[in-house]
Design a protein with these regions (language model features):
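A short, surface-exposed helix-loop junction/capping segment
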Residues: 2-12, 52-55, 147, 151-152
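Charge-rich, low-complexity N-terminal segments
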Residues: 14, 24, 41-48, 52, ...
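Active-site nucleotide-donor binding segment shared across nucleotidyl transfer reactions
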Residues: 29-70, 196
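Conserved catalytic core of two-metal-ion nucleotidyltransferases
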Residues: 81-118
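Catalytic cores of NTP-dependent nucleotidyl/adenyl transfer enzymes across multiple folds
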Residues: 114, 120-178
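Feature detects long, helix-prone N-terminal segments enriched in hydrophobes
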Residues: 174-231
Length: 231
């Protein structure tokens, strides 16, 4: 089964059809967008093996230029992808959606999230999926959070309450997933507090025993409601 009536909060057993439809959608978008999409990935709960999910396919499109994606708007619409300009997350994302709801019905089937490639939005989408697929016990914990919320709220419960109820788990897990994504890799860091740097505050001082810095472009996890809703 693919699709859910807009506003419903219902979970279904994992279905192999979701992976097939995700791959089909990725391939279709690649044909339409060509090199204007740096990468396209199936994300969201339907991309996480074995856990229950809303049967809506989420796709992340990574690009270097939103305008180049928008230049394909007519072709995307012809293929059933409706641009939703009121969901641009302050310029950080473009959203396209599929389903009869956008043509007078009530079903939503796909959400296409266009973000800057290698941005925090992109990293979060990919890291959360890969981390839960690598650690099925954590994926099961997440499923338990979701099923508990559905039991509490009911199938026609507040979607906002459902999204808010997942936020703490997703935020905590994303922090772990971000660190995990760098394990075993060589990274370049900007050092802003070198070895021996002295930090003085309120009567005490701290001398840094090592070089302290950050990975450029990697920020503290700040999640939007749109991101949380995909999982």
């Amino acid at each position: 089964m693919i699709g859910l009536r807009r506003g419903d909060v219902r979970l279904f057993e994992h279905n192999k059809e979701w992976k097939i439809e995700g791959e089909r959608t990725v391939n279709e978008l690649r044909k339409i967008l060509g090199s204007d999409a740096v990468d396209i990935q199936h994300i969201g709960s339907t991309s996480i093996k074995s856990i229950k999910a809303k049967p809506i396919i989420d796709i992340a499109v990574g690009t270097d230029d939103f305008n180049r994606i928008l230049s394909h708007e007519a072709e995307l619409l012809k293929a059933g992808y409706h641009y939703r300009p009121n969901h641009d997350m302050g310029g950080a994302q473009l959203l396209f959606a599929c389903g009869s709801y956008y043509e007078g019905g009530d079903m939503q089937t796909h959400f296409i999230h266009v973000v800057k490639y290698n941005s925090m939005e992109w990293r979060n989408y990919i890291n959360f999926r890969d981390y839960l697929n690598t650690y099925p016990e954590i994926a099961k914990q997440y499923e338990n959070v979701k099923t508990g919320l559905v039991e509490k709220l009911g199938s026609r419960g507040s979607r906002n309450d459902y999204v808010d109820g997942k936020a703490e788990f997703i935020s905590r897990t994303l922090r772990k997933a971000m660190v995990w994504s760098f394990l075993g890799k060589t990274v370049t860091m900007d050092i802003d507090r070198p070895l021996g740097y002295v930090h003085r505050k309120s009567g005490y001082k701290l001398v840094y025993p090592l070089n302290y810095g950050y990975i450029p472009g990697v920020l503290l996890i700040q999640l939007s409601r749109r991101f949380i809703s995909q999982y």
